[in-house]
């Protein structure tokens, strides 16, 4: 695309428009500046609320993929790519899953997480190649993230995923975007022009983060990774998480700190297993087998077994 064509294309994007509510932001003192930013930020959850049906549909497709061994792959450039990498990296400690289950790809590779890599987003071929490099298959789901909805790197990835029959999801902050047109599910929270014109790391980035939170959290809940609203598959990999594991067991069972700690040590800090043992009086092997029989759903395991 020529420079003139690109300028014309950007002129039609909501996310590139000038915000009439912040035209004088350069004249304001600090408190007034952050108040204006805060006023704009308040619009974000309202925009996300309007696309909850699409988010729920995406959750169902992601959950279905997980159940057959598929992966969730995020791909984006710049802020969009970094947000995908961030959400993917939080899944193993939060939900006790493999770091291969949710993958974040950013245009330009890992180096682009810390420092912008100029031109990386302009290649659709690079998007396709990055998916090929991780052996992306039709069992997987790809979420293309682009505030503008027109990033070539993301378009290339989505088109390749479509070619091999994988599920494609587009996350953009502009209506009727190019990536929305080629995806199975289009999630488009329109947050309006940014407080600082074109700086889509602001409202657009916040909206994307909220949506990504929902996609992984809701999908993991659907897989039985929570009991009530407790993170029962959390991995106790540091002192804070060891303490959190004990608190979760105490909250789920009303047991003492001493009992929670003792049983957690028996289970090698498998929180879900410790809770089931305390609530049902099962020994560790019986509890493990019963939990497996209920496909890892702790609530089902508890409700289907009465204490001795």
Swiss-Prot record:
Residues 62-225 form the SIS domain. One of its GO terms (biological process) is N-acetylmuramic acid catabolic process. It catalyses: N-acetyl-D-muramate 6-phosphate + H2O = N-acetyl-D-glucosamine 6-phosphate + (R)-lactate. InterPro entries: Etherase_MurQ (IPR005488), Glucokinase_regulatory_CS (IPR005486), MURQ/GCKR (IPR040190), SIS_dom (IPR001347), SIS_dom_sf (IPR046348). Keywords: Carbohydrate metabolism, Lyase. It comes from the Bacteria. The active site is at residues 90, 121. The keyword Hydrolase does not apply. Signal peptide: none annotated. One of its GO terms (molecular function) is carbohydrate derivative binding. The keyword Nuclease does not apply. NCBIfam families: N-acetylmuramic acid 6-phosphate etherase, PRK05441.1, PRK12570.1. Homodimer. Specifically catalyzes the cleavage of the D-lactyl ether substituent of MurNAc 6-phosphate, producing GlcNAc 6-phosphate and D-lactate. Together with AnmK, is also required for the utilization of anhydro-N-acetylmuramic acid (anhMurNAc) either imported from the medium or derived from its own cell wall murein, and thus plays a role in cell wall recycling. A lyase-type mechanism (elimination/hydration) is suggested for the cleavage of the lactyl ether bond of MurNAc 6-phosphate, with the formation of an alpha,beta-unsaturated aldehyde intermediate with (E)-stereochemistry, followed by the syn addition of water to give product. Belongs to the GCKR-like family. MurNAc-6-P etherase subfamily. This is N-acetylmuramic acid 6-phosphate etherase.
């Amino acid at each position: 695309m020529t420079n003139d064509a690109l300028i014309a294309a950007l002129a039609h994007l909501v996310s590139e428009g000038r915000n009439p509510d912040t035209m004088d932001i350069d004249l304001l003192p600090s408190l007034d500046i952050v108040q204006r930013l805060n006023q704009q930020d308040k619009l974000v959850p309202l925009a996300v609320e309007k696309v909850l049906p699409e988010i729920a549909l995406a959750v169902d497709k992601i959950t279905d993929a997980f159940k057959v061994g598929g992966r969730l792959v995020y791909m984006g450039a710049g802020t969009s790519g970094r947000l995908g990498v961030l959400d993917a990296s939080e899944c193993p400690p939060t939900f006790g899953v493999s770091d291969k289950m949710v993958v974040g790809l950013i245009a330009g590779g890992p180096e682009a997480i810390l420092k912008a890599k100029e031109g990386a987003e302009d290649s659709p071929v690079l998007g396709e190649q990055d998916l090929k490099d991780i052996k992306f298959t039709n069992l997987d789901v790809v979420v293309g993230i682009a505030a503008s909805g027109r990033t070539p790197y993301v378009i290339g990835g989505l088109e390749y995923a479509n070619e091999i029959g994988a599920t494609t999801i587009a996350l953009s902050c502009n209506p009727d975007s190019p990536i929305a047109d080629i995806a199975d599910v289009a999630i488009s929270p329109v947050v309006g022009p940014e407080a600082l014109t074109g700086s889509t790391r602001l409202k657009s980035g916040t909206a994307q983060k909220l949506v990504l939170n929902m996609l992984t959290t809701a999908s993991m809940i659907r897989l039985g990774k929570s009991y009530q609203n407790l993170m029962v598959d959390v991995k106790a990999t540091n002192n804070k998480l060891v303490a959190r594991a004990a608190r979760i067991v105490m909250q789920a069972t009303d047991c003492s700190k001493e009992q929670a700690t003792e049983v957690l040590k028996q289970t090698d800090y498998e929180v879900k297993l410790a809770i089931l043992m305390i609530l049902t009086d099962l020994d560790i092997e019986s509890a493990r087998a019963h939990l497996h029989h209920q496909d890892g759903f702790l609530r089902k395991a508890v409700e289907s077994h009465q204490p001795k």
